[in-house]
Regions:
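Phosphate- and divalent-cation-binding pockets in alpha/beta enzyme and binding domains
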Residues: 46-47, 105-106, 130
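Hydrophobic, well-ordered secondary-structure scaffolds
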Residues: 77-83, 100, 113, 128-131
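A glycine/threonine-rich phosphate-anchoring loop and its flanking beta-alpha core
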Residues: 9, 109, 114-148
């Protein structure tokens, strides 16, 4: 049950990175009424169900995406944002990315532009996402002119 926290300090902000066992139940992690989980459809259902079970007290919206570079697009982002707005998500609510770098980039982009910024939690599931995409605050999607 040991939880570890690393504080990242940048020029513009400070934020925590939590790591360790059983951190999903950390109440300070979410502090929201509604949570949107955006997940890679290759994540085993048993793991997604464990996450969902830990969030049972929240109003949940779950997206399981077929992940490719085409997923990291304005079209996909707009569809999710429109649905979040229809469900009255607001700035006090949270988006959780549960997957690799593509899911993290898309989810953080959505969180950053919806209602001028929703809370964001990244649960990276690939090594590259753990050491690169989940640290540093990069948000981005691909465009017709190139990969972000």
């Amino acid at each position: 049950m040991k939880k570890n926290k690393l504080i990242v300090r940048t020029k513009s902000k400070t934020y925590p990175i939590y790591f360790g066992k059983n951190i999903l139940n950390n109440k300070n992690l979410y502090n929201a009424k509604k949570i949107c989980v955006i997940s890679d459809n290759r994540i085993p259902k048993v793991l997604l169900n464990k996450l969902i079970k830990s969030l049972k007290k929240y109003q949940l919206k779950i997206y399981r995406l077929h992940v490719s570079e085409k997923t990291k697009s304005l079209t996909v982002a707009n569809k999710i944002i429109d649905q979040l707005l229809e469900e009255n998500f607001n700035r006090s609510d949270c988006i959780i990315a549960f997957g690799g770098g593509i899911v993290g980039d898309l989810s953080s982009f959505i969180a950053s532009i919806t209602k001028r910024g929703l809370k964001f939690v990244n649960i990276p599931t690939t090594l590259l996402a753990q050491v690169d995409a989940s640290i540093g605050g990069k948000t981005g999607i691909n465009t017709a002119q190139g990969k972000n």
